[in-house]
């Protein structure tokens, strides 16, 4: 059975501000199944932002597990991500999940990959999903050459990705921590 997939999630950190945004398109093969999905959320008492890309059911499974790790480690983002990655590498069921997460709190942004890796993005900019490369390139150019806020950079990056990637639409949800 073919999986639901296709999205763009991008995060930009500048100083003490971070924005995380994503589009709303859910695709099954070459059919748009939903245009207004919410793939970016606030969790852990609104202190942590998370965005997910990949198979929808897999992403929700990982999100649930990540929230449990955050609770267990009292909101310590890095510790929760590393513990999730350890589980991901050792649990046979988790190893088959095809999804990625970007997580951010007031001080840290992390990418949790489908291989169970935890990455701290260079320059505070990262993106995942089918339109991730477009969004990340746009965000990097905007961050290096403008005074735009993280939210504005995320918005424009998602717009550019939506113009270029057939699996990304212009329904955007953006969350910030300032």
Swiss-Prot record:
The active site is at residue 7. Keywords: Allosteric enzyme, Cytoplasm, Hydrolase, Metal-binding, Protease, Sodium, Threonine protease. One of its GO terms (cellular component) is HslUV protease complex. GO terms for biological process: proteolysis involved in protein catabolic process. Na(+) binds at residues 162, 165, 168. It catalyses: ATP-dependent cleavage of peptide bonds with broad specificity. Disulfide bonds: none annotated. InterPro entries: ATP-dep_Prtase_HsIV_su, Ntn_hydrolases_N, Proteasome_sua/b, Proteasome_suB-type. Its main location: cytoplasm. It holds the Pfam family Proteasome. Coiled coil: none annotated. It is found in: Cytoplasm. A double ring-shaped homohexamer of HslV is capped on each side by a ring-shaped HslU homohexamer. The assembly of the HslU/HslV complex is dependent on binding of ATP. Belongs to the peptidase T1B family. HslV subfamily. HAMAP family: HslV (MF_00248). Protease subunit of a proteasome-like degradation complex believed to be a general protein degrading machinery. This is ATP-dependent protease subunit HslV.
């Amino acid at each position: 059975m073919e999986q639901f997939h296709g999205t763009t999630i991008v995060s930009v950190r500048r100083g003490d501000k971070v924005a995380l945004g994503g589009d709303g398109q859910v695709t099954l093969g070459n059919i748009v199944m939903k245009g207004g999905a919410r793939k970016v959320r606030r969790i852990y008492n609104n202190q942590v932002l998370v965005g997910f890309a990949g198979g929808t059911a897999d992403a929700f499974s990982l999100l649930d597990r990540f929230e449990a790790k955050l609770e267990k480690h009292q909101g310590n983002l890095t510790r929760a991500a590393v513990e999730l990655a350890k589980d991901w590498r050792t649990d046979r069921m988790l190893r088959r999940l095809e999804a990625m997460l970007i997580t951010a709190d007031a001080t840290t942004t992390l990418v949790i990959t489908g291989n169970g890796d935890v990455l701290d993005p260079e320059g505070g900019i990262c993106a995942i999903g089918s339109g991730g490369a477009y969004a990340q390139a746009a965000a990097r150019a905007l961050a290096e050459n403008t005074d735009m806020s993280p939210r504005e950079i995320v918005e424009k990056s998602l717009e550019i990705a939506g113009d270029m990637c057939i699996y990304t639409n212009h329904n955007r949800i953006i969350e910030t921590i300032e």
